């Protein structure tokens, strides 16, 4: 831990130098190329000629928050089913073919996006592009395959959620955080709805959302824009656009949040008691200019790591928590979240003390803001992470793919370090004053018990 004034001054000086030179370093990164095919597929190429490998990612502008009511989990379920078969690729062979070519592949589903990706040698890029384009439009499913895979996702839910008290707590708090917005529904789905998902549900979702004009292709690695364009036109370019996919994504929006909510969950499988607090805040897509960056820096200072205010107050000074932290998640299309937690060092009876101390830390941030030294350290840490990420091909592709799939531009994505560097202490104080408001939040207590697992949500109470 840094506690010497001299060391702190040295650290601040070094951080200032990093901020001064960071823009030059960042602008030296490989230049991206962007183009669009005639069928609407957006393509971004990120050259990286250090090794003869490429990362190929296709991002669909659809996620769990786009699901029709009553079929929660269908977006994630379809992600699983995409590894079944087409007329060209036999059942279960997609990943095996990629592996035989010396590569690896995976996929993931979020509330707003679904992505499929491969890392492969440069000379095999055309093959994986052909395979990925094939399953964009030619997926074949049998009832037996769908029902078998449905059992797989139900077991996944049981192992990841039902057998994990912390995951149950997170799910219950998230459901309480949103009034009607689908972010309150877990990506994996509610079990009672997952159990009824059918082949027709999957194919209806697939045929509507999986189309070139609803996707972004990102290729990073030892390639040129001309090479990728030729391959993209030969593969993805042969797929017609789907005119039924709208440019705007319609989701129910929540009304203003006016009442704090609480969730208490007891489970005999829980270890130490823990405190949780989530706030609904703007995302990078919905915040005013500079506001999301201010929230990022606010949480870096408030709750990220052992030097954060929250950790020092609860763990080091008061010793009422064994760990504490938090973060800002601003990657949502409609909303972002601030999440805070602390694990009690003692018994569940300490949770009210933890809550009171955490509230004091939040009040100090609202009333007094942050110091210049804290702000400089937070900026330099973020920009250093950004620079290091530029050396990771997959991270680069993910950065561009996720942002573009949400509707951000290449200029906005590449301009993030400059936007971070322009945030002032006043900007952070304003963000804290506006958004660290318990009326926008859900507070949770997770406690061990000898009782059967239960979850309770109290009725919202108006704040006087």
Task: Locate each region found by the language model.
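N-terminal secretory signal peptides that target proteins for export/translocation
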Residues: 1-8
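Bacterial N-terminal signal peptides
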Residues: 9-22
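Sec/Tat signal peptide C-region and signal peptidase I cleavage site
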Residues: 24-28
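M16 family metallopeptidases and their MPP-like homologs
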Residues: 46, 51-67, 73-77, 91-135, ...
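Active-site SXXK
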Residues: 72-86
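Non-catalytic, conformational "gating/processing" segments within enzyme and secreted inhibitor domains
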Residues: 150, 200-235, 440
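His/Glu-based metal-binding/catalytic segments typifying zinc-dependent metallopeptidases
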Residues: 158, 175, 244-307
């Amino acid at each position: 831990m840094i506690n010497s004034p001299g060391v702190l001054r040295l650290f601040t000086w070094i951080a200032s130098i990093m901020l001064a030179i960071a823009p030059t370093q960042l602008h030296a990164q490989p230049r991206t190329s962007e183009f669009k095919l005639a069928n609407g597929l957006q393509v971004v190429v990120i050259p990286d000629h250090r090794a003869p490998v490429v990362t190929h990612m296709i991002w669909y502008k659809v996620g769990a928050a786009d699901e029709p009511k009553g079929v929660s989990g269908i977006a994630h379920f379809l992600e699983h089913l995409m590894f079944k078969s087409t007329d060209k690729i036999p059942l279960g062979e997609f990943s095996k073919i990629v592996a035989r070519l010396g590569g690896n592949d995976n996929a993931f589903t979020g509330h707003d996006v679904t992505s499929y990706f491969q890392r492969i040698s440069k000379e095999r890029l055309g093959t994986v592009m052909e395979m990925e384009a094939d399953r964009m439009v030619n997926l074949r499913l049998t009832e037996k395959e769908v029902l078998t895979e449905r059992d797989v996702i139900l077991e996944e839910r049981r192992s990841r959620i039902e057998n994990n008290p912390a995951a149950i707590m997170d799910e219950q708090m998230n459901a309480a955080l949103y009034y009607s917005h689908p972010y309150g529904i877990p990506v994996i789905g509610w079990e009672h709805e997952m159990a009824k998902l059918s082949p027709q549900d999957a194919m209806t979702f697939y045929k509507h959302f999986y189309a070139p004009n609803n996707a972004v292709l990102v290729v990073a690695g030892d390639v040129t824009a001309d090479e990728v364009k030729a391959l993209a036109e030969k593969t993805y370019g042969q797929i017609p656009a789907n005119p039924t996919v709208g440019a705007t994504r319609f989701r129910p929006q929540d009304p203003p949040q006016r009442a704090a909510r609480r969730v208490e969950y007891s489970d005999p499988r829980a270890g130490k008691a823990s405190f949780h607090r989530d706030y609904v805040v703007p995302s990078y897509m919905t915040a005013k200019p500079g506001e999301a960056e201010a929230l990022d820096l606010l949480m870096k200072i408030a709750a990220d790591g052992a030097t954060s205010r929250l950790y020092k107050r609860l763990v080091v000074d008061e010793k009422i928590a064994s760990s504490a932290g938090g973060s800002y998640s601003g990657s949502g299309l409609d909303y972002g979240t601030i999440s805070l937690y602390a694990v009690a060092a003692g018994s569940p009876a300490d949770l009210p003390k933890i809550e009171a101390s955490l509230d004091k830390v939040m009040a100090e941030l609202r009333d007094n803001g942050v110091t210049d030294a804290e702000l400089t350290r937070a900026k330099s840490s973020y920009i250093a992470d950004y620079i290091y990420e530029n050396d990771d091909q997959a991270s680069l592709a993910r950065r561009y793919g996720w942002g573009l799939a949400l509707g951000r531009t290449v200029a906005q994505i590449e301009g993030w370090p400059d936007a971070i560097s322009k945030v002032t202490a006043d900007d952070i104080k304003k963000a804290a004053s506006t958004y660290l408001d318990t009326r926008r939040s859900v507070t949770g207590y997770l406690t061990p018990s000898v009782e059967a697992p239960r979850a309770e949500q109290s009725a919202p109470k108006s704040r006087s």
